[in-house]
Amino acid sequence: MSASRERKKRMQDGNTPAAAPQKKKKKLSEGWLLAICVVLVVALVFGGIFGFRAYQRSRTVLTVGSHEVKVPEFNFFYNNTVGSFKNYASYVGIDTATALDKQNVTTNAVTYLPIFGVDTSYLADYQANDEGIYEDVTWAQLMASATKDVIVQTYAVYNEAVAAGYTLDEDDIAEIDSEMASIESVAVAQGETVDELFARVFGNGCDAEGYRNYMVVVHTAAHYPTTLKYTDEEISARYEESKEDFDVVSFYLYTTKASDYAAENEDGTKADPTEADAAKAKADAESMANDFRAANDAVTVCADYTKASITSSYGEEAATWLFETAALDGEQVKLFEKDDTYYVIKLAAKGDYQSYNALELFIKNDSEEVAEGEMTAERKIAAINASMKADHTEENMKAMIKTYGNGSNGVVENMMRNSMAGVDKSVFAWGLEKHKAGDFSSFITDNGTMYLFITGEGDTRLNVSVSNTLSNEWINSINEAASASCGYDEDAAMAANVGLVLGTN
């Protein structure tokens, strides 16, 4: 029988004990009173601290649609923003040994920030002092504002994806699971739980569940726009709006200028070019124009350039010639002069073209001595060459990628000429030729050896370009609406883990 039921039974039986005689109360000593007061004060202080921290973690930094971004989630995005900016710290004068919330933004930094993709409109409401320092703006504030922009765009797209019923595929989920497993193994190796690791790295309130949700949101926002499809009518209508934004040409370029021939001063600097130097530069350019050699090491490739980009770099005359006069079955080479520089241009391709779907494998040159037991780049290349010579199939190419591709699946969709030119001039030249599924080639570049296996035709460059533009315009429109109503709370953002030190994060 329970104690309460036993007490109840005794009361019901009338067997309740008699009231105990009252005892005289003892007065507590002053020492005990002081000790109790100290305990109460400590409890109040620490209880207040923990309560305050809990309140800070629960604050809403911004809202996108119906989703409220709390401080812990903001920490994940903020940490990524800061991490991606780490390599640019020296350019903008950030001290990598000092917390970001202890350093102020400078006007010198503002000059470089747009180059690194950082919007400086946040600074419009602030004034720098005579020394070029924004006394009221720390790097933490600017980074937090940049993070806000990333979150708004991410969730604007994510919300649309959810509304459309889009979900990540098995490969995307597997990638997220793999990353989570890797992080957990790090935590175990360091003798802590995975939630403890997240809290330590990202801030209080951050845990494994929150990080996984963050990864799902980011991956969804990144992949969903690529699934958007546009009709031929939509693509045609957008192309007609501004053809000049989509029409492109590709060409080889040889550049020379008078300063290339200027003498060297005793201190090692270049002397000012003379008229004789200018004459040599012009003669050199004329020689190349008369006998253009694309294989010349000084010749570069400019692939998929619009008329506006050519005008900006090489002059309006060059742009007009390339788009209106130059032809593969006619005039292909011409010399132009702009700003004391001579440009010899040879047309390589013009108009729309079919892209390729391919499998790609790149074996990077060894930059240092290879560790014992690891294969050298030379051995990898020899093994791949021998295997592909014996078995010239797509399945074997996939096997080579699985063995030597460092985790990449090697799949490339809609490979364009500009991406080929970015690898090497020889890859670009190969891409100009007509290829079919099963065609395979290797290319030795300055950085390593590249293998390409064509799996089929992709979409036309024009369709891809216009579709990307339509997608970007859609993203910008929903982003603008979401940004206007996000209700960004900078005070709440500053309650996040914003005091990171670039040298240790």
Ranges and model annotations:
Residues 53-204:
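N-terminal targeting/tethering segments
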Residues 1-14:
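N-terminal targeting leaders characterized by basic, low-complexity, disordered sequences
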Residues 296-305, 395-407:
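Short, well-ordered alpha-helical segments enriched in acidic and aromatic residues
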